[in-house]
Swiss-Prot record:
The gene is MNN2. The keyword Transferase applies. Pathway: Protein modification; protein glycosylation. This is Alpha-1,2-mannosyltransferase MNN2. Its cofactor is Mn(2+). It comes from Candida albicans (strain SC5314 / ATCC MYA-2876).
Amino acid sequence: MIAKQKIKILIGVIIVIATYHFIVSSNVRSKDLSDLVDLGSSDKSTTENERPKNNIVTNNRLDNPPNEDIPHAEPDSPPQEPPKSGNKPDFSIFFEGLEKFAIKQPGIKDKYTSEKAKEKFSTDDNFLFGKEYLENVLDIPQATFKELKDSHKRYVDEHIPKMLQRVKTFGSLAPSDKEWESYKGSSGYIIVGGGRFTWLSFLVIKQLRATGAKLPVEMFIATESDYEKEFCEKVLPKYNARCNVFDYKLADDLKKRFDIGGYQYKMLALLSSKFENVLYLDSDNFPTRNVDYLFESDLYKENNLLLWPDAWARTTNPKYYEIAGVPVKENKLRYSKYDEKQAGGKDKLKPLSEYTFKDSWYHDFEGTLPDPTSETGMFMVNKSSHLKTLLLCLYYNVFGPQYYYPLLTQGSAGEGDKETFIAAAHVMKEPWYQCARQFKWTGYVSKVDNKFTSKALAHYDPVQAQDTTRQDVDIIFMHLSYPKFYPNWLADNHDLVYADTDEHIRMYSSINKNVGYDFDLRVMQFFTEGLCPNYYDSKTGKPIENIPHIDYTNDYMGNHLMYVKDEEQNNIDRCNKVFIPHLKWLKETAEIPTVVS
């Protein structure tokens, strides 16, 4: 009897304890519960009631439950970084590990055995740019040569194949991204801005739209200090253009790691562009016609890399081809003007097979890049089809200033990035096409010394220029390299008005018949309305001339760009004395009707 009572009491105690435990358990804080759940969670979610009953917590870690996978990371380890959002492009992959290919030997820029390579036109017939001459311009130590060759080979043979497994275009998008569908086949223009270059680029965009071009434009902005919110968000959208603002942190990182800047921004603009097909323009390169059609031309679609020629003879060091692993054979492919002169005329030229490296221009032989050099103030490229080319081009530009720029040009005219595109395509055996017609020096005969003064380079339509017998080839670009349209440059150097006589100058009149309008007048109109606050009536905000569709608030760039605003007082004086009178004179003397708005 007593035993039965003890059993009943024991059962009662157990029930009380169980009830108390249940009440306490039901009041456990939700945070504590969630912590426990998180600690034991695997890829397959499990509720508290579904957990095996024998799970126990020790030292803040959940022992591995039966029939449940071990988590990939320890619960107390740092959380993994989430995937990059499609809205935040990550371009750092293109620069990962590039230090492995850095050349440790001192740079070879300006390291000449006696003097830099001679600056001669590609049509020069007096100087022999032979192999012996070209390989003795730069002083390249053997240790530097070996390191360059090793770095180049490893980058091409090891790094590029690995990159091709990771990326499908020269940019941040992948075929699995939702934006890929709109990216594939897209086309547009890119131009580099920032500070005074934003001002020049804006003039180019105005001119581009005046030609009737419709495709979108990106203005690349590399640094935070160069971003101008008002201009980027209110002005450019009116022209179907936008600011392409590069990742500031990455830009700073690249500056510290590789001293990226200047010419190299061109590669960053390409890399970060939202267009697959790109027509790049320098900020002083003005289209004269609507060039949208080039993207649809068979010439572009067949090659996917279009270039335009410079005037200069190629001065690439023969050791570059050894470094790049490109064999050059003593098999002459073409004649030069030098050959013609040495022979005493075209009809006296000996067979190509009889020429050697000693008696002919080196870059007329098999395996070399042909004359003339390239002018990359404009070029077109497909970032997917020519991914290998652009990857190598990136390498050439990252290590360009101290090594590859000198190798490719040896201090001759225009040393910089301009030969890196054609060289990279040549090495990677991807197609390219360079316009068959060289540019036209554009300017006028100065009344000061009665000599021709060159002011711009007029480049031709590469499609029309395929017919080398055709004379009436359209001029489609005007590279206004000297002078550039900076107000102080134009005024102080008397580029628009003779200093002694106050007589006005029309710098580009020789192209007007070709393009069908007064090019000086068109560009000067855009320049004046953007630069001169006194071009507008102070009361109405309308221009002092009867020009529709423009006003002070929207079209005077002092309201939007610090470069213009900071010089406002000086510009008012320049506008009164030079720019407004010059614009008026251009209109009064125009021989071809010209739409200026």
